[in-house]
Amino acid sequence: MRFFLLAFIPLTTLTVMAQQSQSTDVPSIRSHLCIDVKATLGEGALYCMHDSCLYWVDIEEGILYQCRLPVQHCRRFKLPGRIGTVVRDKNHHAILAMETGIYSLDLHTEELCLICSPAENQTGIRFNDGKCSPAGSLWAGTMSTTGKRKSGALIRISPDGKFTKMIDSVSISNGIIWSPDGTKMYYVDTPTSTVVEYDYNTKADTITNPRIVIRIPHEMGYPDGMTIDRDGNLWIAHWGGSGVYCWNPETGKLLARVEIPAKNVTSCAFGGTDLDTLYITTARTGNSEETLKNYPHSGSLFIAFPDNRGIPSYSFSKPEQ
């Protein structure tokens, strides 16, 4: 089935500065407006080393963006329904967590195919953020579409289509990432304002021994999507916090803040040839008209250049691959 509208969006080179950080005791990093798309709910930033492309989604509008930098345009795919997150396989497919299941989008032919769908009734539930694990499965969270708390979960979806519930009673499943050595997994359930660390077993693709390693003050907003650098520091997008905050999970200390001229910052990913550029998504939803006047580029894609490098993202990989 083909459902897509293909468009090209110009790259913006405008440099912008956010308001002065309230976290005056940590370094402040400047951000730049990269692509002015004004997404309703930008999310799911992912950089793929296989094709040197950045991917992200507008959840509410059902749009997938694919941008090959530094070429100054990106492709826009309009799909039939909300998209919670995007990952890549090792071929030419984007793997999408949509409302009715997990889909594969052929980036060459634009054909959308269902891989698998949940066995249980998903009424009032949608997928949200997610990433591929070192073992090659997709770990994607769910959340209520009506605001009901503890009705979501973190689901592991294997390439053969098997769904396994890994964490239950989640309110807003959000950021998830693995440590550079693959022995830890970090996870965010947004309303808890915490980051939980788990021991991760790559061979079994399982987690054990949860413990809170970061507690985020409410005045800094709420934790949303996140990524990790080669030193093991977490870069967390703060919804309502106008920034991406760098936290040390070993100490729980805040190390730096990337200032973003948007109130609701949603996800981030290291990208570029050397994985030294931080790409940041934002949202227009959840803002008053006055806030949108103060932050007119809300919903756009931003970039920053911290003195840190990320690690490559994992692929949705079938056993034979």
List where the protein language model places each region.
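Beta-rich, blade/repeat-based domains predominating
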Residues: 37-51, 80-95, 121-137, 166-184, ...
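Conserved beta-strand positions in repeat-built beta-propeller and related beta-rich domains
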Residues: 48-49, 54-59, 95-100, 138-148, ...
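Hydrophobic alpha-helical segments and helix pairs
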Residues: 112-168
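Loop/turn-rich, solvent-exposed surfaces of beta-rich toroidal or solenoidal domains
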Residues: 194, 215-253
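Short loop/turn segments immediately following beta-strands, especially the blade-tip
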Residues: 198-205, 306-311
